[in-house]
Structures are given as structure tokens and as C-alpha cells.
């Protein structure tokens, strides 16, 4: 990818499980759930491998089919990440995102499969690579309280289970992920200003 002309646009990205990403302008990018859609076929293929005798030709064939099914899911996810990252890089000069510790998040067994299916870590590395090639900047923001802090007045008064943010102090009312994206943008601009 060649360096791109400036667009004077910025985007803050809040990665999530309900929607893959929510931008500061309110745009929501829906998650394709590649693994979840293929899960039944993958389980069937895995069962076939388990039922075959070790070392047999039928088992080798079943293992190849299972690997092919997993590869298809991997490529679908990768294709989605490349398309979203390219779109964001083409439209924006600066991209802000949370500095997520996905390895720690995977310890939560209730969310691990969904987090793996979303592939946030892979997406962020693809985004950083494409941005560097295009001469764009990517700023990672500490994720502490981005979803809980009000983007209007800065008050922290809600738990993570609340999906709709309504501030009791200033009256700001919007989706929690949109609120988080606005906070990420504000923090990113502050960090970028301190570096520049």
C-alpha cells in the first residue's frame, strides 16, 4: 500500500462482542461470527476424526477435512479484518483504539470463545500494519473506565452490565459502546497532543 493523501479525519474504535466495532461517530460494524456459524460443521468433522482408527487412511482423510474446515473459518475472519482495516485506513488519518490485553480476557471462560471468534488481536495488528504502510497513525489508549465514564461530563457512575448509557448528571444518553468510542477518541487526542 502506498502512502495516502491526508483526509483530516479521525476515528476512535471500541471493539466489542455485540458488534465488532463501534466508531465515535456512532457507526457500528457488525461481527460476522465466522466460528459460531461453522461450529456445528467443525464439531461433526471433529467427531469423524475421533471415531476413526488411529493410523488409518480414513482418519488421515478426516483430519485433512477438519483442518480444511478450520482454515476456511480462519480465512473468513482474516478477510473480514483486512476489509474493515482497509476501510478505516482509507478514510482516516488517525485511528484510536483501546490497548486490549486479550490474553487476560481469554481467562474468562464465558467470553473466551466469542473473543477468539472476534479476533481483536489479529485485527489490531492488521490495522497497525496497514496504517503504517499508508502513512497513518494509530494511537493505543489505556482501556480503564472507557465504557463506564460519561463522555459528556466525565462522571463514572455505572457498571459494565448496563448496555445503554444515561448520565444522571448531564443527561447524556447513548449506547454504551458509542460512549466508550467517544471516550477513546478524547483520550487518544490527549495522548497524541502530549506526544506531538
Where are these regions (language model features)?
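Positively charged, helix-rich recognition surfaces that bind polyanionic ligands
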Residues: 1-196
